[in-house]
Amino acid sequence: MILDIEMLRSFYASYSESVAQAKATVKRPLTYAEKVLFAHLFDPTQLRSYKRGVEYVDFRPNRVAMQDATAQMALLQFMNAGKDKVAVPASVHCDHLIRADVGATQDLPEACKTNKEVYDFLKSVSQKYHIGFWGPGAGIIHQVVLENYAFPGGMMVGTDSHTPNAGGLGMVAVGVGGADAVDVLTGQPWELKMPRLIGVHLTGKLSGWATPKDVILEILGILTVKGGTNAILEYFGEGLDSISTTGKATICNMGAELGATCSIFPFDQNASEYLRKTGREEIASLAQMNAAELRADDEVLADPSAFYDQIVEIDLSKVEPHLNGPFTPDAATPISHMKAKGPANDYPMVVEVGLVGSCTNSSYQDLARAASIARQAYEKGIEVKGQLIINPGSEQIRYTAERDGILDDFKKIGALIMTNACGPCIGQWKRHTDDNTRKNAIVTSFNRNFRRRADGNPNTFAFIGSPELTVALTIVGRLDFNPATDTLLDKDGNSVMLDAPTGFTFPPKGFAVEDKGFIAPSEENANVEVVISPDSNRLQKLAPFAPWDGKDLTDMPLLIKTEGKCTTDHISMAGPWLKFRGHLQNISDNLLMGAVNAFNGESNKVKNQLDGAYVEVSTAAKAYKAKGICSIVVAEDNYGEGSSREHAAMEPRFLNVKVILAKSFARIHETNLKKQGMLALTFCNKDDYNKVQEDDRISLTGLKEFAPGSKLTVTLKHKDGSEDNFEVEHTYNDTQIAWFKAGSALNFAAKK
C-alpha cells in the first residue's frame, strides 16, 4: 500500500485537540499555518508563543520525501546513523537523473542504463530501511507526492526546495538539506526558525488567459526572491474557491523562489474533491471531520493585519498573464508590456523552444489546458514556429493524458513528449541547436531561469510563464505576442486569434494507470545488502568531517569574492554534474564554477595565492587543502538562493573552506552550511564587503567566545601591508554552535 493509513488515522484523531490546546495556551485565535506548526511540536509540553523569525523550534514532521539527486547524500548519511529502519514514512523518487534528448521512448531506457548503479543503490537502501521507492519514469517527486501522499494539516520535509508544492493540499511542506532529512528519518527533532507569517489575500476570480501561475509570478514581482525568507505565505480570501488544488500547488511550489519556508492553502471542497479523485476517500472524510481547524480562525480572517506580519493583496480579476525573466524569476513582466520592454532591454524576441512540465506545472489540468491551445493551432492551420517539449508530471498523468487524446494534441503540432521527469528544468536537456553559445530565447512553465540553468548556454534568455502561454508563444515564435489581443495568420493568410484556454480539472473518465512504478516498503529487509564499490566514481561512503580545533581562524586566503547573484546552481551546478551527487570528492570539482569573480568579472577563474596563477575555483581550494590551509568565500546578498542541494555546503566543507561571509543568506543554504560544521557569517555593515581585496589574508577571531548573539571580528591583511578590521554577525543558537565544534550536525548526533 502506498499510504500509511494508520499513521493518518492516528494523526487526525488527535489533530483538532492539539489545535485546541494550542489556542488555550497562547490565548488567541490562530492562523492555519500556526495550527499545523503547533500540532507538530516535537515536545508538546514546550507549547508556547514563539518569537517569529527569531526563535528556533523543534518539530516532528509526518513524513520525508527525497529525489534521486539529493537522496544519495541523504541516505549515505542515514546509513552512518546505525538505524534498522526509518522513524517516519519516507519515499525516494527517481526524477532528476533522466536526460531529455529525443523522447521518452529512448531517453528512459538510456537513463536506466546510464544510472543503473545509482538506481540500484537507492532501490536497495529503500528496501533495507523501509522506504517507498518510485522508479525512473514514475514521475516528478512533487506531483507524485501531491497525488499520493499529501494530506491537509500534515507536515513533511523533502530534500528538494520545491517540496512546498504540497501546500496546495494544506500541508506545511518544507524543502531541506539531506542532513535535516536525516534528523527526521532517525526520529530526532527537526529544528526550524519559527517563520514569520505573510498573509496573501485573494479576491476576485481568474479569467481569460490568467492562470494560477500568473498569481505567483505577480507576487514574485512584489516580494522579490528575498521577500519570503524565513516566512510562510498563507493564502486566504474568497478568491480561493476558484482555484483548483493543482493550481494552488503551483502557487505554493514557486513560493520557493520567494525564499519562503513554505506556502499553504486551507482545506476546502476543491481539496476534498482532489483527494477523492486521486483515490483517497478516507483521507477526505477524515479531513472533513477536522475542517474547522484546517483553516484560519474566523477572528483571523476578520482582522488579518492583527495576526499576519505582512499582508499582500491580490485581485485575481486583475491578474494578467506574465513572463518572468530573464535570469531571475522575480523580473515580472505582464505580457502586455513585453512589446515595449523586450526591445528596450535587447531581448532576443524569437522564441525558439517552449517547454511545458516541471514539478510546477505538469498536472492533468495543466496539460489539458495547454493542449487546448495546441489543438486550436492544428485545427486553424496555424504554422508552429518553435519547438515544443512536454514533460508529464507522473506516469498516472501521462497514461491518462494519452488515453484522453491530450498527448496527441501536442504531437499533432510537432511536440516531443519526454519522460515523466524534471529534464530541462534542472539542466537535464541535450538541446539540439546549431550553436550552444548563441543568444536566443526560450519560454518555459518551469520555476527557475538562472543563466545557464536549462541548457548550459549563458546566452539563453529563459522566461517563465504558464503552460498555456508557453504553448501560445511557441506556436507564434515571439516573446511579444499577447494572445488576449493579438492576431496571427492561418495557412490561408487569414487573421485569426487564439481562444482563451479551456480544459478539465479532472479527467472525465477518471485517472488511470497500468503501472505507477512504485515499490512499497518491505518488512523483509534483514538480508538486503547495500553495495558501494570502492572504485565507483558515482557513489562514495562518507567520512566524518574533522571537529573544530579550538583555535581562531588565521591568515585564510580568499578563495573567491563573488559578485551579484550566487545561487546553489552557481555553487554546485546540476546538469552533467548530477551523476556525481553521490560522490563528494568528484562533485567537488564543480565548486563555485558558475560564480562570478568580483575582481575580473569571470566565472571559475580565481587567483591561487600560493603561486599567483589564475585557476578554477576547485583547483585553488584543493591546493590550499593540500597545504593544510583553510580558505574563505565572500559573497553578496541572498547567497545560496535556489535549490535545497546540500552539496553546495558539503563541497566547500570537503575542500577545507571554513567560512562563508555574505551580506545575507537564503534560508535553506544557511541551514545546510551550519549542518556541515561551517561558519555562515554576515556583515554587520554591508559596505565592508567592498574592503575585501583579491590578495587578502583573512583572520576570524572571537571563536572561543562564540555564543548566540555574539559578534566575531574579521581582520583583512592587504598585500600592501595595511589592515582593515570589522565585526560580523551570525544566527547560530547553542545547538548549532555545538554542530560547528563537533565538525557537523551528524558528528554531534553520533556523540549523543
Predicted stretch roles:
Residues 3-4, 68, 151-284, 416, ...:
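Mobile "lid/hinge" segments at catalytic clefts and subdomain interfaces of large enzymes
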Residues 8-11, 15, 20-195, 581-633, ...:
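Long, structured ligand/cofactor-binding scaffold of large enzymes
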Residues 42, 46, 51-60, 74, ...:
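Terminal amphipathic helices with adjacent charged low-complexity linkers/tails
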Residues 47, 147, 151, 243-249, ...:
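Short glycine/threonine-rich loop-to-helix capping motif typified by GTGT followed
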Residues 76-80, 305-401, 405, 524-659:
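Non-catalytic terminal/interface segments that mediate subunit docking, oligomerization
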Residues 379-429, 435, 643, 649, ...:
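Extended C-terminal subregions enriched in glycine
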Residues 488-505, 670-739, 746-749:
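Acidic, glycine-rich flexible loop/linker segments
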